[in-house]
């Protein structure tokens, strides 16, 4: 069977997304990030009009949120989209390269932890920054529930994002956000027309055994 990607489920719906919540429920390798970079980002650039003529304040912009610094580095590489290795750990050099890349005029990449820090500094300043964006992408959205047991600040990021659902297109993406999906369905804030899913692929591992003695291991190898 030919592998399917989430873009084949969404098709052209993204062109008609209105303000509110979008849920993309799909596993690793389903093309969630690829959809954002190769479909939604070019669409945002197109909708913004000519780069040299358009008012920067009227650009259609995307804020891409993720839960870990290593993932942020991967997303930044994907935004460049040139197949080159960029020095994401060298801020000054990276900043110069980003300024030279058109894509970064339309998309920013943050961690959820940055949202938390900025909110603690000044909720008002953070709101002014977030008001610049049309799309908010919440990658690995299970962070809001999965990390909550050991990170009391997680709810800050979630509340900040939730406040924008009425004024932005907020896209939640994850393979394991069932708790969030159940909550949104219960409170009536997730339309089934805004829910996109791909069945999770079964892994290749059928059985996992642990052997604590060398003899057991040797018998398995010899069998």
Stretch-by-stretch model annotation:
Residues 28, 35, 40, 58-83, ...:
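Conserved Walker A/P-loop ATP-binding site and its immediately adjacent core
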Residues 42-62:
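Post-Walker A helix-loop "phosphate-sensing" segment adjacent to the P-loop in P-loop NTPases
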Residues 64, 108-111, 137, 168-175:
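Structural recognition of the conserved hydrophobic beta-strand(s) that form the central parallel beta-sheet
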